[in-house]
Amino acid sequence: MEAALSLRGLLVLGVLLGVFAFGCDFSSRREPSEASGATINKRPVAIAHRTFELAAPPADMPPLSSGENAQCDSNFVSNASVRGETRQTDATHATVTITRIKVTLGLNINIWVPTDATQRVIEHEDGHRQISEYYYQTADKLAERIAASYMGKRVEITGTDLAVESSKMLQQMAREITDEYNRELNPEPTQLLYDGITDHGRNEANVKDAVAHAIKNVAVESTQPSSNPGN
């Protein structure tokens, strides 16, 4: 039995790195509003179970790697919206203070199995789902910590059009927030360790035990050098 690595390359963590919103309150002198702060919007996990014919997989299904016949496609979504208040010092210089950050999180899981999939294959892919959901459980705490590190930050900007420069800076900061979230979340090593324990669903390893072992031991076992590099 064979099962796909659930990550589809890099778990599609970066799929929305470039999707963000930003805002700018541009004024010469203005105190932060009472509504200032960081807000995390964590959406419920969305799960879809899909079946397909191995000989004719649907167009919207991610391609299977060689030797695979199923996969759990986990898409972690992160969108950041950053707002700041600008204090202009002269015609071409200003200081932007970050006053509000909103981060929206999501996890979309599509489990793809062939119509003739065995129960072991189905259970193996569900193990990948469990790992993804484990990491998503505390994703809001991670996003909150990252957003908090940007709140109140002051950034100097220069240019002939300070409104444009402020928007560019806020846009870049939104990117940085989602980049950091995706980098720190990173369930990929755990998913890879799980596949190693179960041989992609081909051995008799208990799924529940394999998931628990991968989560508990990933920090140690994922850093050990492979005895067969490149395999």
Name each model-derived stretch.
Residues 2-11:
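Bacterial N-terminal signal peptides that target proteins for export
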Residues 12-20:
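Bacterial N-terminal signal peptides
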Residues 20-34:
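Bacterial Sec-dependent signal peptides at the C-terminal "C-region" and cleavage site
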Residues 38-97, 103, 150-231:
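Metalloprotease/metallohydrolase-associated module, dominated by Zn2+-dependent proteases
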Residues 92-119:
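Active-site scaffold of zinc-dependent metalloenzymes
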Residues 118-127:
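Short alpha-helix carrying the canonical HExxH Zn2+-binding catalytic motif
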Residues 126-142:
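Catalytic Zn2+-binding segment of zinc metalloproteases
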